[in-house]
């Protein structure tokens, strides 16, 4: 597990203040960033990922300042950013590019450990049987799950996701979020996820940070995420009732029709046997 510390971070673009003295710490949690478009969620994630630098303040991962892009931070985007024309397996392998540096080495020189890690990541997101299917033939939800697998191949200490289900239908969105949370749990990764769908956020989040105009409006646990707080955050918009816990349900139907056991992490596939066959090939 890992600890992310955001210490008094301000980010400005000219006269525009995108983040204003933001501070929080996350350790071993699945945390959701909430807020309207333009609230600062994406800017916050870009600062954490090292894609942009704070104007003031500091961001640290396990005590080390984040000063640039790091291979131990996995990022999942709203747009899948997958490689066209290749399989889910090959797309998952691109998560190791920081270690291999070139596409040529990705295709020809991966060791068995890296190949196995890619297949295990696909198993985590319920796509092991589809590992050799071209991602262009997959649904949007399946493609996003490949994106999660790709991030896991990096073996990250921190997992970030920027509106990962914004373009998906409700059923696919719930499935992707379920696999994302499972991935963070199985791989023991601290996660920070930005969402605008309050119901989905309330169902999956373990903690909620509300951003408005670049400032933290609230930082609360699930039981304290009230409709009043949500109305304050989104300007008194009409919201559907917050999601309730259904942790007693041990199975869900994924977007590809698979009956998935959320407790055992199994879709009925013999993981060891399948991984063994595919790695050897």
From Swiss-Prot:
Reaction(s) catalysed (UniProt annotation): phosphonate(out) + ATP + H2O = phosphonate(in) + ADP + phosphate + H(+)
Residues annotated as binding ATP: 35-42
Positions with biased composition (Low complexity): 244-255
Molecular functions (GO terms): ABC-type phosphonate transporter activity; ATP binding; ATP hydrolysis activity
Stretch list, region Disordered: 243-281
Compartments (UniProt record): Cell membrane
UniProt domain ABC transporter: residue ranges: 4-238
UniProt entry keywords in alphabetical sequence: ATP-binding, Cell membrane, Membrane, Nucleotide-binding, Phosphonate transport, Translocase, Transport
Annotated membrane topology: Peripheral membrane protein
Main location: membrane
Signal peptide residues on this chain, from the entry's feature table: none
EC numbers on record: 7.3.2.2
Pfam families: ABC_tran
Glycosyltransferase among keywords: no
EC class name: translocase
A GO cellular component entry from the record: plasma membrane
Coiled coil: none
Binding partners and assembly: The complex is composed of two ATP-binding proteins (PhnC), two transmembrane proteins (PhnE) and a solute-binding protein (PhnD).
Assigned protein family: Belongs to the ABC transporter superfamily. Phosphonates importer (TC 3.A.1.9.1) family.
Protein name: Phosphonates import ATP-binding protein PhnC 2
Organism for this UniProt entry: Haloquadratum walsbyi (strain DSM 16790 / HBSQ001)
Lineage: Archaea, Methanobacteriati, Methanobacteriota, Stenosarchaea group, Halobacteria
Gene: phnC2
């Amino acid at each position: 597990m890992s600890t992310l510390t955001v210490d008094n971070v301000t980010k400005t673009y000219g006269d525009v203040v995108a983040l204003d003295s933001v501070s929080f710490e996350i350790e071993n949690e699945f945390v959701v960033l909430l807020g309207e478009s333009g609230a600062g969620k994406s800017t916050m994630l870009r600062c954490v990922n090292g894609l942009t630098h704070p104007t003031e303040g500091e961001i640290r991962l396990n005590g080390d300042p984040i000063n640039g892009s790091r291979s131990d931070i996995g990022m999942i985007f709203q747009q899948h950013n997958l490689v066209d024309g290749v399989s889910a397996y090959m797309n998952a392998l691109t998560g190791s590019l920081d270690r291999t540096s070139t596409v040529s080495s990705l295709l020809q020189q991966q060791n068995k450990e890296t190949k196995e890690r890619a297949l295990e990541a696909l198993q985590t997101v319920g796509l092991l049987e589809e590992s050799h299917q071209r991602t262009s033939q997959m649904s949007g939800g399946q493609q996003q799950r490949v994106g999660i697998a790709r991030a896991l191949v990096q073996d990250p200490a921190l997992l970030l996701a920027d509106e990962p289900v914004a373009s998906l239908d409700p059923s696919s969105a719930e499935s992707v979020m379920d696999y994302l949370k499972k991935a963070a749990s199985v791989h023991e990764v601290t996660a920070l996820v930005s969402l605008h769908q309050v119901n989905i956020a309330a169902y999956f989040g373990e903690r909620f940070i509300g951003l408005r105009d670049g400032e933290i409006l609230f930082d609360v646990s699930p039981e304290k995420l009230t409709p009043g707080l949500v109305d304050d955050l989104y300007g008194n918009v009409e919201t559907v009732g917050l999601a309730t816990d259904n942790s007693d349900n041990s199975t869900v139907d994924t977007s590809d029709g698979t009956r998935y056991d959320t407790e055992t992490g199994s879709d009925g596939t013999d993981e060891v046997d399948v991984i063994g066959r595919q790695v050897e090939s």
